[in-house]
């Protein structure tokens, strides 16, 4: 039976440390603040906003919300971002993406108007560059950093280990590979054009699955003693939920097949996702510390 790498334990430890850092900042007259920019009333955005606000309040970080209409113009949204850049009381900004459909073609341009020093969710090119250069140009993406927090909390040493990342997105796969390399792991990144992903995955000491495909990580992809970080959040219409009905979130892994084989695994839900929000708030705290 695999050890469960539970996000709630990681989050509890992170929150305690962050609360102490916030207290130290406030003693110096600095009150960390997160700006949340939302266009419209997307239910998933509202859900994440609620969770992020609650986590921020728990840690002691202020939240200021900027709610714009779904049909907001490109110019109006950029003006809002520039106003946040100019507001010294705001230390970090979370803007929900994807942006409304009429702004899709301009999303990268709009995102890059945010100052990297306030880019706590890694939506600018400069923040992404920081991940690849190892320089503190902005902040790393929250989800892959949450993976690293889990590895650190559970004392999993990456030095000299073979690490395989399934997925090459700029949001998770690529930065996760760079972060693992920074921990002195030897990386392999698999994607949709990779030949024999299962064979490559079986040779990993640390396997990060960020494919975003339900039930894609079967017993054929894993081997004894592996550390499996299941990043993805998928909808499984057949999975029994907390109310006893059908329909619940699940990761890439066929948990019933993979869990008996590997050494440790993050469950979904209850794994990486639960840590990500504390990483976001931690970035706000760090952004505030950088102003001292």
Q: Where are the regions a protein language model picked out?
A:
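Rossmann-fold NAD(P)-binding glycine/threonine-rich loop
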Residues: 108-120, 124-129, 232-291
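Positively charged, low-complexity intrinsically disordered leader regions
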Residues: 1-30
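Short, well-structured alpha-helical segments in soluble
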Residues: 76-88
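Anion-binding alpha/beta catalytic cores of soluble intermediary-metabolism enzymes, centered on
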Residues: 92-158, 215
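Glycine-rich phosphate/diphosphate-binding loop of Rossmann-like nucleotide-binding domains
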Residues: 39-54, 135-231, 239, 246-247, ...
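Short beta-strand elements in bilobed, periplasmic/extracellular small-molecule ligand-binding domains
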Residues: 56-70, 187-189
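Short beta-strand segments enriched in small/hydrophobic residues
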Residues: 31-40
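Short, high-confidence coil segments that cap the C-terminus of an alpha-helix
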Residues: 89-90, 204
